[in-house]
């Protein structure tokens, strides 16, 4: 029995019984992790969803599960594509950065470290099996907390697929690396037949140009994808972020567009028609009812595309690009040449968080000299959408936070300039890091796990709950997901991140205040077994109304029960200064964040003491070994 969903085929086969030789590759099921989900739900208000009645709220929760499953299905499809390409090349797995534990999500869930395509295949088989289980839960009636558990499980599985997809292109890509800010854009595109690759295909540009041979040199191969690299002749030239695809397609500057199974939806066909471009959809593309010319000879497929159809489907990606290139040569002289959007992006060099980087960053994060790590994720669809996430990044960078940006936002930030014409990358080269493709979001979660491996000697193989508990109570990081609308990939990732113990801030939503129910999180001191009041982080997932609230909330959610007095002082000082800058007063919740006198920053001692006296604050004990697990 099996199901197919967005290019993912999930088969339910035989069960692996205990003692089987393959059992060591079996990852945890949702039911095995349900106690952890219930622990999180008992401490944090995760299952808070809008609705006037219980029935309406449950329907919203069910929709969230559906989005998480759709997002995870797409991520698995992407991972399968790149793993198959890895298998075809025969290359050994090389994640592209120096780390003793390069794929920590895989190692935590599956209990081993992958070394080749077959190992990655085993990880995807597990992901597909658990996705099937999550989909089947949609047929059952759950409580809000039950749907929350299913959504988090689907999201966590999606992050595993992300990690696999992120590791593989590092082996396959051959792009020019840069140690400095570099510029991409459309300003100097030559006027010749143009093929625009939209999605993941630009990452494999060197394979495409090699396969197409002289044909590749007769056309201009340009791309919209979720990362960028300096231009080179034998690769696809990136001209903008994937999230802005509608703006680029509708401009009509490309003669033919090739779209794969990345983020774009069915509106790509309409956008291409609006621009007068032909379109070729390939594996995973979310389009329907196109003529499938996969089995046609190339010449016949080109003829059909040029003379009969506006858009066709080709299953094999390289063949799809070949058909597009020949078609571009045919149609280029028969259509009005249009100008591309005039866009330029000065992008910071993609940075991998190696063990060396984590060691250098880990100590100041623990000490509070770096008050926290904030991962900022957004999918700006047009230039105006960049301003708010850029402002969030800017105010956090000014206060010393380490800000990591993956995917389309990492590219789009290259268009946000100050009065002197400088980008944030040029102003904050050491603390604003472009981490690469959007799939690197999983690598960012993995970096939090590797902090525990490097500094806490944390055993991770098969230890999901122990790892998530460590991250939640000791690693001062949070994620901000920003935008008017979220793709299903982003929804899936947001719920998966929560499962790993990393707080997520969502926004903007003008109705945000009505969605928050306050709790008073407590932790257990494993040394004494006593329950200790320490609402840091105060939320694991929350919705905010505007960019200022997002920045403030992120600063607060980077505090942890394990903070040393010096570390908490520095975090409180950064939080107070940021709050004052944005709102002109002291934050009203300092009584929740200051455990005793040693947490009060020296430079703010008198005024904070005065505020604490007004609130009736009394010192609290601190947990020397914080955990949410009763057994410690």
Curated annotation (Swiss-Prot):
Protein name (database record): Putative acetyl-CoA decarbonylase/synthase complex subunit alpha-like
Pfam families recorded: Prismane (PF03063)
Biological process, per Gene Ontology: response to hydrogen peroxide
Function: Part of the ACDS complex that catalyzes the reversible cleavage of acetyl-CoA, allowing autotrophic growth from CO(2). The alpha-epsilon subcomponent functions as a carbon monoxide dehydrogenase.
Molecular function per GO: hydroxylamine reductase activity; iron-sulfur cluster binding; metal ion binding; peroxidase activity
This protein's UniProt keywords: Iron, Iron-sulfur, Metal-binding, Nickel
Record-stated family: Belongs to the Ni-containing carbon monoxide dehydrogenase family.
Lineage: Archaea, Methanobacteriati, Methanobacteriota, Methanomada group, Methanopyri
Source organism of the structure: Methanopyrus kandleri (strain AV19 / DSM 6324 / JCM 9639 / NBRC 100938)
InterPro entries assigned: HCP/CODH (IPR004137), Prismane-like_a/b-sand (IPR016099), Prismane-like_sf (IPR011254)
Residues where [Ni-4Fe-4S] cluster binds: 200, 226, 263, 379, 408, 438
């Amino acid at each position: 029995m099996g199901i197919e969903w967005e290019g993912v085929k999930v088969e339910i086969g035989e069960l692996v019984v205990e003692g089987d030789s393959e059992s060591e590759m079996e990852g945890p099921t949702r039911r095995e992790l349900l106690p952890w989900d219930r622990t999180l739900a008992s401490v944090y208000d995760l299952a808070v969803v809008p609705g006037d009645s219980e029935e309406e709220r449950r329907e919203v929760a069910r929709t969230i599960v559906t989005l998480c499953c759709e997002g995870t299905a797409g991520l698995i499809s992407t991972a399968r594509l790149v793993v198959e390409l890895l298998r075809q090349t025969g290359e050994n797995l090389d994640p592209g950065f120096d780390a003793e534990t390069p794929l920590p999500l895989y190692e935590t869930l599956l209990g081993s470290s992958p070394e080749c395509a077959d190992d990655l295949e085993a990880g995807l088989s597990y992901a597909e099996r658990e996705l099937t289980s999550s989909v089947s839960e949609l047929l059952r009636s759950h409580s809000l907390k039950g749907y929350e558990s299913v959504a988090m499980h689907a999201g966590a599985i999606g992050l595993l697929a992300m990690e696999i997809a992120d590791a593989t292109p590092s082996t396959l890509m051959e792009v020019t690396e840069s140690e400095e800010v570099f510029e991409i854009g459309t300003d100097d595109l030559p006027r010749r037949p143009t093929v625009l690759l939209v999605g993941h295909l630009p990452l494999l540009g060197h394979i495409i140009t090699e396969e197409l041979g002289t044909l590749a040199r007769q056309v201009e191969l340009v791309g919209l994808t979720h990362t960028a690299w300096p231009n080179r002749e034998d690769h696809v030239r990136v001209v903008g972020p994937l999230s802005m695809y509608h703006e680029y397609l509708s401009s009509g500057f490309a003669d033919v567009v090739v779209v794969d199974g990345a983020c774009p939806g069915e509106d790509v066909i309409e956008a291409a028609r609006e621009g007068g471009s032909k379109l070729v959809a390939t594996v995973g593309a979310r389009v329907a009812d196109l003529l499938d010319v996969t089995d046609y000879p190339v010449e016949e497929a080109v003829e059909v595309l040029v003379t009969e159809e506006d858009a066709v489907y080709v299953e094999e990606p390289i063949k799809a690009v070949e058909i597009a290139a020949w078609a571009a040569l045919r149609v280029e002289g028969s259509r009005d040449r249009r100008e591309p959007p005039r866009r330029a992006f000065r992008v910071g060099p993609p940075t991998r968080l190696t063990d060396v980087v984590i060691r250098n960053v880990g100590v100041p994060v623990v000490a509070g000299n770096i008050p926290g790590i904030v991962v900022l994720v957004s999918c700006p669809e047009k230039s105006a959408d960049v301003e708010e996430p850029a402002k969030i990044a800017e105010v956090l960078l000014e206060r010393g936070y380490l800000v990591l940006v993956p995917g389309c936002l990492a590219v789009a930030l290259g268009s946000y300039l100050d009065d002197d014409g400088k980008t944030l990358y040029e102003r904050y080269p050491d603390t604003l890091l472009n981490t690469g493709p959007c799939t690197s979001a999983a690598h960012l979660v993995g970096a939090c796990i590797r902090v525990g491996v490097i500094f806490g000697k944390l055993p991770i193989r098969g230890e999901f709950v122990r790892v998530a508990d460590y991250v939640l109570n000791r690693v001062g990081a949070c994620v901000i997901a920003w935008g008017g609308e979220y793709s299903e990939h982003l929804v899936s990732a947001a719920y998966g991140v929560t499962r790993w113990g990393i707080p997520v801030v969502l926004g903007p939503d003008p109705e945000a205040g009505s969605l928050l129910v306050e709790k008073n999180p407590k932790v257990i001191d494993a040394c004494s077994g006593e329950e200790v009041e320490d609402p840091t982080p105060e939320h694991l997932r929350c919705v905010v109304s505007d960019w200022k609230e997002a920045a403030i909330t992120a600063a607060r959610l980077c505090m942890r029960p394990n903070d040393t007095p010096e570390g908490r002082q520095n975090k409180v000082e950064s939080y107070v200064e940021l709050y004052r800058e944005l709102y002109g007063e002291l934050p009203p919740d300092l009584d929740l964040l200051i455990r005793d006198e040693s947490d009060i920053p020296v430079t703010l001692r008198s005024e904070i003491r005065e505020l604490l006296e007004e609130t009736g604050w009394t010192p609290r004990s601190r947990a020397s070994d914080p955990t949410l697990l009763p057994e410690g």
